[in-house]
Amino acid sequence: DPETFIAPMIDHGPYRYQKINVADSLLHRNSLLHCIIDIANTRSEFPEIGVAPFRLITIDNDAVLGIYYETDTRSILTFVNFSDKPVNFTARGIRHATWTACLADKRYDDALVCGKTVALNLSGYGYRWFWTDRTALR
């Protein structure tokens, strides 16, 4: 019953419930709701982010932030593009390992193959997270 809601339903304008609602968003894999659900689920799978020791990764593009988290059991890499433009970038100082993608703003064709440097791309405001088991680090 709408009369018992804490706040009134938005029934006019571009955000009205007839246009944007949870039931409809759940049907569309590319919806903002699914994006938030994916981020929340991935974040809960990797509690190291935010609490584990970390270091910034050296990147040749000022628009990209790279962070490396490390615990006794696994390592995590996160990259975020703070520019509205797509970027290609090179990151240095990443340990050689088999890295698995765990979160991204879209599907990317390139893979994280580590040597002394790593070359990747990100869409405008894009993000990519990778992880590896610590036993895989070389």
Describe the role of every protein-language-model region.
Residues 1-76, 82-88, 93:
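Loop/helix patches that line or flank the sugar-binding groove of alpha-linked glycan CAZymes
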Residues 77-80, 101-102, 131:
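Conserved active-site loop/cleft motifs that coordinate metal ions or position small ligands
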Residues 80-81, 125:
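Active-site beta-strand/loop signature of hydrolases that rely on acidic residues for catalysis
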Residues 86-107:
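Beta-strand-rich binding/interaction modules
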Residues 109-111:
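Surface-exposed loop/edge segments in extracytoplasmic proteins
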Residues 113-138:
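C-terminal beta-strand-rich structural cap/linker in extracellular carbohydrate-active enzymes
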